[in-house]
């Protein structure tokens, strides 16, 4: 996470597939990333936030996240489907808005900074929340994962097996192959022979 967040060489703006550039974008990817990470770190730890609402929040609070000093007419950008030029501040949502959305649904999710959510009918993510690792990652530390595997399980006289989630994965796989799935209760998986 630290290597990515401080990189000058990775430019996520080039991952926004809905836009094309006449020449390489003259943005500062590290600064843009840093500004977005600051906004994420200032958000409440609990609750879900609409991606569109967050894009609007960035628009109101930090509109120059990509094109610094009002360079809205200086970059030659066009819509990749229609070829229409996207010049001027009126196209902020198509450029900066898509960038913010892509960062949430892409790198912020890939690195475990945010969790995504959507309704059953939606095709793409509609909301996000800070993950349980967000504070740790934003402070430059690696998240802690369980280091020890559980060796405890229950096998009762009725052929009911209860295995802890942290039981060795290869053994859980074998149990799942020869048993019928029963239920998951918290961090425990239940099977029946």
Where is each model-derived feature located?
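Extended alpha-helical interface modules used as scaffolds for assembling large macromolecular complexes
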Residues: 2-193
């Amino acid at each position: 996470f630290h290597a990515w967040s401080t990189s000058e060489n990775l430019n996520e703006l080039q991952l926004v597939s809905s836009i094309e550039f006449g020449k390489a974008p003259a943005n500062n990817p590290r600064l843009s990333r840093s500004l977005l990470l600051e906004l994420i770190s200032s958000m409440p730890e609990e609750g879900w936030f609409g991606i569109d609402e967050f894009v609007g929040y960035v628009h109101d609070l930090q509109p120059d996240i990509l094109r610094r000093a009002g360079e809205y007419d200086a970059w030659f950008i066009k819509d990749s489907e229609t070829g229409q030029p996207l010049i001027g501040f009126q196209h902020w949502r198509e450029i900066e808005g898509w960038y913010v959305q892509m960062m949430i649904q892409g790198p912020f999710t890939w690195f475990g900074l945010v969790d995504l959510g959507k309704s059953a009918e939606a095709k793409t993510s509609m909301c996000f929340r800070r993950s349980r690792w967000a504070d740790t990652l934003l402070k430059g530390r690696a998240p802690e994962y369980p280091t020890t595997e559980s060796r405890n399980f229950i096998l009762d006289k009725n052929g009911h097996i209860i295995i802890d989630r942290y039981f060795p994965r290869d053994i859980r796989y074998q149990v799942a192959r020869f048993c019928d799935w029963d239920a998951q209760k918290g961090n425990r998986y239940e099977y029946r022979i």
